[in-house]
Amino acid sequence: LDFDLGTLLEDIADTLAVRAIEKELELICSVNPTLPQWYKGDPGRVRQVLTNLIGNAIKFTAQGEVVLHYELILSSDGRQLLRFTVTDTGIGLSKEQQAKLFQKFSQADSSTTREFGGTGLGLAISKQLVELMGGEIGVHSEPGKGSSFWFTLDLEIAEAKIEPIK
């Protein structure tokens, strides 16, 4: 399925902006004009993963910002991959917490569940979706310094579609 990545990212940002505004957070979605805009893939799965990562970033950030950034990178075997990164100025995670993060029903600890809510399924589902699309997902984080969740996808570039004006 061909999809317009820029439009998809704008839709996601628009959907989550209300939550960010309620918490007085800055939600920054940096669309890279030098990269192709159209890709072949599953926009529904991409949307679900990004919505989950950005939603979590907003949930666990009390002040500051949540930034979505994407870029093309080269894999170790020379393939071009699209790498998405969601960075926040939130509570951050210890190495021990990071190790359990992508398991089902896992949250940083029980106090996190009480304070922030949620089932602990979001990251496990995101990991599964990313892997179904042939990608990888990971996190870099430090307690008190925020987190940076990333995932890579091997999406084929599609021909740009020009939509008729309605």
Regions found by a protein language model. Give the residues of each.
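Conserved catalytic submotifs in the C-terminal HATPase_c
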Residues: 1-4, 21, 26-37, 73
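Short alpha-helical Gxxx[C/S/T] motif in the catalytic ATP-binding
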Residues: 117, 122, 126
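Short alpha-helical segment within the cytosolic histidine kinase core of two-component systems
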Residues: 10-22
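Short helix-loop "hinge" at the ATP-lid/N-box region of the Bergerat-fold HATPase_c
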Residues: 57-58
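Disordered, acidic interdomain junction associated with two-component signaling
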Residues: 22, 30, 75-80, 96, ...
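Short conserved segment of the HATPase_c
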Residues: 93-107
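Glycine-rich ATP-binding loops of the HATPase_c
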Residues: 134-140
